[in-house]
């Protein structure tokens, strides 16, 4: 009986030792997982940079004039693309510049080109491993239709959704509104009554590289 008790006590101690070892190993694994997760989630600081390549579909919406009357754009669906560079000023806020372009066809098959060059500011919301950037771009837009060309102001608010593949690369999509007021003073060849406010949008896929 005494031998049995001794064996039972030794077995109990052995089980406690094994259980403690397993628990410690599990805790170490959990700590490593938490560490990996914490280090994998992007945390940005002043000077961290990003480069974007975007491409997708350009969607004409409508024009309206100074009186508020709405007109069809008479444009087909088109294509658009852009290159963007940004630098972080804080963990959630970045600024930079964007150069883009689009094309679409008029009813008589003339091609409209627009080439916007903008300064851009972005605020980033993060939900690991996803990020949601909300941006505003302001700048100048060169519109070209055959021999006619005009430079106008442009504003482009946008929202995106990105998945972080790793610490350097992310892939996502953006929806962007184009507001292009084409205003004539009447002092030139075009009367002021021909001023129009263009409203368009695009939906693009994006590749993001951090460095």
Q: What do these predicted ranges mean?
A:
Residues 50, 59-61, 79-155, 163-169, ...:
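Gram-negative (and chloroplast) outer-membrane scaffold detector with strong preference
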Residues 1-47:
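Cleavable N-terminal export/targeting peptides
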Residues 42-44, 70-74, 86, 110, ...:
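Alpha-helix initiation/capping motif
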């Amino acid at each position: 009986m005494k031998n049995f008790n001794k064996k039972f006590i030794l077995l109990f101690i052995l089980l406690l030792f094994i259980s403690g070892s397993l628990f410690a190993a599990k805790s170490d694994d959990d700590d490593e997982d938490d560490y990996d997760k914490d280090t994998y989630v992007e945390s940005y600081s002043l000077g961290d940079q990003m480069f974007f390549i975007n491409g997708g579909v350009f969607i004409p919406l409508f024009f309206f004039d100074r009186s508020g009357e709405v007109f069809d754009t008479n444009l087909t669906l088109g294509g658009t693309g852009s290159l963007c560079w940004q630098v972080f000023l804080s963990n959630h806020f970045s600024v930079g510049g964007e150069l883009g372009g689009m094309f679409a066809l008029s009813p008589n098959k003339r091609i409209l080109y627009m080439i916007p060059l903008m300064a851009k500011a972005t605020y980033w919301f993060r939900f690991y491993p996803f990020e949601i950037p909300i941006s505003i771009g302001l700048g100048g837009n060169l519109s070209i239709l055959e021999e006619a060309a005009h430079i106008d102001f442009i504003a482009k608010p946008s929202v995106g959704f990105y998945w972080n593949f790793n610490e350097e690369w992310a892939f996502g999509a953006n929806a962007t509104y184009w507001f292009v007021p084409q205003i004539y003073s009447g002092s030139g060849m075009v009367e002021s009554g021909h001023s129009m406010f263009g409203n368009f949008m695009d939906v693009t896929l994006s590749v993001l590289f951090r460095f």
